[in-house]
Structures are given as C-alpha cells and as structure tokens.
Curated annotation (Swiss-Prot):
Domain of life of the source: Bacteria
Gene field: hisA
EC number: 5.3.1.16
Enzyme class: isomerase
Lineage, uppermost ranks: Bacteria, Pseudomonadati, Pseudomonadota, Alphaproteobacteria, Rhodobacterales
Protein name, as recorded: 1-(5-phosphoribosyl)-5-[(5-phosphoribosylamino)methylideneamino] imidazole-4-carboxamide isomerase
GO biological process, one term: L-histidine biosynthetic process
GO cellular component: cytoplasm
Alphabetical list of Pfam families matching this protein: His_biosynth (PF00977)
UniProt entry keywords in alphabetical sequence: Amino-acid biosynthesis, Cytoplasm, Histidine biosynthesis, Isomerase
Family statement: Belongs to the HisA/HisF family.
UniProt-recorded Gene Ontology molecular function terms: 1-(5-phosphoribosyl)-5-[(5-phosphoribosylamino)methylideneamino]imidazole-4-carboxamide isomerase activity
Length: 240
C-alpha cells in the first residue's frame, strides 16, 4: 500500500479542516512547498494535494502554491479541488501534476470523466466523498441520493486510474477511518481504491491493511502534522 501524505491548500497555506468546515482550518505550514519537500525527503513516493479554495470556487485558486510544490519536488503528485472541465485538467497535467482527481464533476458530468480518462490514461482519478454511504459534492456542501458503490462501478469501463474514497464524518476528526465501508468499496469495484478521511494512527493503517481488501493506499494529513503518526513507521507498516 502507498502512503499519500496530504497537503490541503487554503489561502496559499497548508492546512487541515475539521470535518470539511472551511471555518475550522488549522494552519500547519505557511510554506506548502517546504512541507512537500519534507514528505519527499522522508521517503514518501507520492503526494496528495487538495486546492480547498478551488473545491468551493469550482476553479483553481491555489495554483501558485501547487506550482511551487511541483518545482520543489520530483515525486508524483495527485491533485483535487476545483477541477471541473477539460481545460483545467489539461492545464494541470501540462504543469506536471501526475494525476488529477475529479470529484463534484464525476457526479454532475460523468461524461467528462470518461473523456478525460480516455484522453489521459492513468492520469485521471475520481474522488468520491460520502456521508453514510451517499455521495456529497461541491466541497461536501451538497448531498446526493447516489450510493458510492453504484457511482464507482459506473466508471469501471472508463479507464479511471483510482478512486479516492473519503468518509466525510471521519475526515480531520482523528476518529479512525471507516474501515468496513472502505474495504467494502474496494471489494465492490475493480478500480483501485485509496482510503482517505480519519487515518489517525498506525493502528488505523494496520486495520486498513488487515482488512484484506485490495486497497491501493491510504491518505493521511492531520495525524502526520500532529505527530500522531510517525512517518517512517507508517511507511514501514504499509510496505510490509
């Protein structure tokens, strides 16, 4: 399993939100590029970047911070937040982002996901954010009647590289991931699933691994910044 350290960008800084609330942001580093370099130097093979302002605005907002991260690091980075049209997808991939994450648009315009995945094989992931198994969109502000497993399966023939599954009620709350729901999704679809939301201890990573589900990896943010998860130990746990 791959450990994806999260760098959530708000107003040019690396922050973490509590349960997706933009008014409950903790700044962890005012230099996201330095933070990214630290993760790379510690042995991380990927970076997970989120343009939080972009997710709410529907268009890129923290482009300068993302570009600074790309200039400072050499490991691949995936990026989500405010990517809702082909021009933005092409822009980010052209700047060196390895994989774009389509969230809201995967619900509102699934044909864009299909077109992008076809045009850029291996470089388009879908971010599915859920509350009680139902998909939420637009920076988690709107809930839908769509079930996560149904939406995931609908993209199986599209060539989507990965699904990033976030349980909103666990995100940034340090309560542990929803292992059962994450494992169930990974078993229900042929698309690689990356666990996100609530990974707050080494035991959480062990639980995801012990689920036996075919998980590609796990994203962790706050726990790495707080020191609740030792990065070297986490990499070792997932590498076993």
């Amino acid at each position: 399993m791959i450990l994806y350290p999260a760098i959530d960008l708000k107003d040019g800084q690396a922050v973490r939100l509590y349960k997706g609330d933009m008014d409950k942001a903790t700044v962890f580093n005012d230099s996201p590029a330095a933070q990214a370099r630290a993760f790379q130097d510690a042995g991380c093979a990927w970076l997970h970047l989120v343009d939080l302002n972009g997710a709410f605005a529907g268009a890129p907002v923290n482009a300068a911070a993302v570009e600074a991260i790309l200039a400072e690091t050499s490991v691949p980075a995936q990026l989500g937040g405010g990517i809702r049209d082909m021009a933005t997808i092409e822009m980010w991939l052209g700047k060196g982002i390895a994989r774009v994450i389509l969230g809201t648009v995967a619900v509102e315009d699934p044909e864009l996901v299909r077109a992008a995945a076809k045009a850029f094989p291996g470089q388009v992931a879908v971010g599915l954010d859920a509350r009680a198994g139902r998909v939420a969109t637009r920076g988690w502000a709107e809930e839908t009647d769509l079930m996560v497993t149904d939406l995931a399966r609908s993209f199986e023939d599209a060539g989507v590289a990965a699904i990033i599954y976030t349980d909103i009620d666990r995100d940034g709350a340090m309560q542990g991931p929803n292992v059962a729901a994450t494992a169930a999704l990974a078993r229900a679809t042929s698309i690689p699933v990356i666990a996100s939301g609530g990974v707050s201890s080494l035991d959480d990573l062990r639980a995801l691994k012990a689920s036996g589900a075919p998980l590609d990896g796990a994203i962790s943010g706050r726990a790495l910044y707080d020191g609740a998860i030792d990065l070297a130990e986490a990499l070792a746990v997932l590498a076993d």
